[in-house]
Amino acid sequence: MSRARETVRRTIRDANRASDVIARLRALFAKKEANIESIDLNEAAQEVIAVSLSDLQRSHVIVRSELADDLPSVTGDRVQLQQVILNLVRNAAEAMREVDDQPRELTIRTEADGGDRVRLTVQDAGIGLGENAPERLFQAFYTTKEGGMGVGLPISRSIIESHQGRLCARPNGGPGATFSFSIPRSGDSVMNALTLGGLRNVAASDGMTQHIGST
């Protein structure tokens, strides 16, 4: 009987988690128009760190910021880009949850990427990518986390691609993994491209709405 009760509790818990994820996805997808503006990516990253710091400290995560001086601004939707940064930070912290034999270090870094792009990187000292090809991490509903829904990274990639950028993952030389995205620096051509429809509803770019249309 106790096993049956535990099965029921687990089923209810998983259903509640799925319902919460679906609600958040619908809220994101309901945003019809992006607020396009010039963004200081350093400032955006610092704001994400600030709102995440208490959770990171409770998880014994050491945060290191390596933010480039005189970083060129980027053009896009601040909320969407901060959603991506927050997701990468949370994933990094989660990857280090079981690490006990070394410091749980999370490094967030910004830099100019060539002459016309800006890169943001989140590096952790967690369990790494294992034998899973990095590209699989960006497939909808693929997850390596217990209880995970596998939607955060696909949505993040859709957001970055809608900003004319690229999001990728790679294993570190030592422990952990590195996730980074690169997007164009601000300029008239970028502003025009985004205004003409580059920043549409991210759901439309990956077909994910068909999975959340009903519960």
Describe each model-derived feature in a short phrase.
Residues D101-L120:
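Short beta-strand-loop-beta element adjacent to the nucleotide/active-site pocket used for signaling
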Residues L129-F141, G197, G213:
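Short conserved segment of the HATPase_c
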Residues G152, S156:
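Short alpha-helical Gxxx[C/S/T] motif in the catalytic ATP-binding
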Residues M1-N16:
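Histidine phosphotransfer helical core of two-component systems
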Residues R5, E37-I49, R109-A112:
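A conserved beta-strand-to-alpha-helix junction within the catalytic ATP-binding
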Residues I160-E161:
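Detector for a conserved hydrophobic position within an alpha-helical segment of the HATPase_c
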Residues Q46, Q57, I62-P72, D113:
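Conserved catalytic submotifs in the C-terminal HATPase_c
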